[in-house]
Amino acid sequence: MKKNYKILLIGYSNIARKRLIQTFVKKKIPFCVASKSFKKKIKGSYQQFNDYNQALKNSGADIVYLSLPNSMHFPWSKKILKLGYHLIVDKPITTKVGELNQLIRIAKRKKLLLTEATFFNYHNQFKFVKKFIGKHRNIEQVFVNFTIPMPKKNSLLLSQKFHGGTFMDMSPYTASINRILFEEKLKKKSIIVKKNIQKLIISYDVFLKY
């Protein structure tokens, strides 16, 4: 019998509002929300919390979807895994390799799901690209360009404090390309970044050789 998992959504981010909640409702997935900033009733949520710790204690959820600012991903992910929840984290899952390795060790030890959420790979253009590559296995070079509209001045994407910037926002896409399209072993990489006056990365170029 297929289990109907309950999801606790921690954080009421743009992606949560625009994509996650409507998907949960459409797919009839039981979910509740923990948000410190949003107090109004959220359609479809079986329960709402204004405190993350209370939500983790009382939600009755099986899976946590973490959708907080980048700088908060690691400490909350570590806590959530230690409490025994399966965990999905908005990209980037962490901002440092050492932090990621810690989370992986905890998840393996406790036999829990730990994954980073990306959405771009479900776009119709990627379905087309995968189909195209499947018919042309002699491809030697792939050029990919990810761009987004300029964020608003108060956006967390432009916040040094919350570990924003282009690299944190877009590098999970870059890292996922090979896994999605080729599944080859990485042999060499080089990265060039451009920073603004606040030392925030605003663009970057990556060369990956497989």
What would you call each of these model-derived segments?
Residues F31-C32, D62-I63, Q141:
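Short, Asp-centered acidic motifs that coordinate Mg2+ and/or phosphate
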Residues M1-G44:
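N-terminal Rossmann-like dinucleotide-binding module
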Residues N101-F119, R137-V144:
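Rossmann-fold dehydrogenase core element
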Residues F120-K187:
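Predominantly a Rossmann-like dinucleotide-binding segment in NAD(P)-dependent oxidoreductases
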Residues P30, H86, L113:
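Residue-level detector of anion-binding/catalytic polar loops
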